[in-house]
């Protein structure tokens, strides 16, 4: 059991180290030797867990997507309407990506042209945004002249953009900046503009990364 526990810990250390390297340098420049050195693990131990750099990258993408799903489920449990869940989840994902190298690496790997990726994290996020937008539309929360496609495209592009900037400037995304973004977007998106302040406040709750 102790040996199994050590193996699990070593695997997680390697995944985090790989995420830090991928997030900082990209897939093409990253090497297994860089990752093993960062993890403080021998090359042999790394190869015991992962046969190739691509195997590591796929595992990082998978863990990033799992982290996103867990965050989204937590937001579903604390928010009411679909629009509230959407705003709160977007706040959480952007701020988590700024702090979590696994999420940052998952986003970076999804769009890295140097490797073939299933874009697992991006596809999951796009799908979730569309699901919540459609639910909001069906509940009468969206303005009549707003299409689900336009809303999904705008929100996905903006949130991923925030996260991409965080890769170069970790302090840039903040609850304050996200509040300003949603204060601009929600009057166009929401059927009831008078709800915008409450939607923004609800979305920012418990997210205090303000600079």
Label the model's feature ranges.
Residues 59, 70-99, 103, 148, ...:
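Hydrophobic alpha-helical connector segments
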Residues 75, 104, 162, 166-169:
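Secondary-structure edge/capping motif, primarily at the C-terminal ends of alpha-helices
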Residues 91-95, 144-165, 173-188, 202-206:
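Hydrophobic alpha-helical segments that form the core
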Residues 123-139, 168-211:
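C-terminal peripheral helix-coil segments that are non-catalytic and often amphipathic
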Residues 39-50:
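Short hydrophobic/aromatic patch on the recognition helix
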Residues 1-25, 29-38, 54-58:
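Basic, helix-initiating cap at the start of DNA-binding domains
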Residues 84, 117-124, 138-154, 172-176:
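All-alpha amphipathic helical-bundle segments outside canonical DNA-binding/catalytic cores
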Residues 91-142:
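Short secondary-structure transition hinges
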């Amino acid at each position: 059991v102790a040996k199994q526990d050590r193996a699990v810990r070593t695997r997680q250390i390697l995944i985090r180290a790989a995420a830090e390297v991928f997030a900082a340098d990209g897939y093409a420049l990253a090497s297994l030797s860089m990752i093993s050195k960062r993890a403080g693990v021998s090359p042999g131990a790394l190869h015991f867990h992962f046969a190739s750099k691509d195997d590591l990258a796929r595992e990082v993408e998978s863990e990033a997507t799992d982290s996103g799903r867990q965050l989204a489920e937590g937001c579903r449990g604390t928010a009411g309407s679909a629009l509230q869940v959407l705003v709160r989840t977007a706040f959480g994902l952007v701020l988590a990506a700024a702090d979590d190298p696994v999420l940052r690496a998952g986003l970076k790997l999804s769009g890295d042209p140097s490797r073939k990726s299933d874009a697992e994290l991006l596809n999951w996020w796009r799908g979730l945004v569309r699901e919540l937008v459609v639910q909001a539309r069906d509940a009468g929360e969206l303005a009549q002249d707003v299409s689900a496609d336009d809303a999904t495209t705008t929100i996905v592009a903006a949130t991923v953009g925030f996260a991409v900037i965080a890769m170069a400037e970790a302090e840039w995304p903040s609850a304050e900046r996200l509040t300003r973004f949603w204060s601009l977007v929600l009057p166009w998106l929401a059927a009831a503009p008078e709800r915008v302040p409450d939607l923004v406040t609800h979305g920012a709750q418990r997210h205090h990364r303000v600079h």
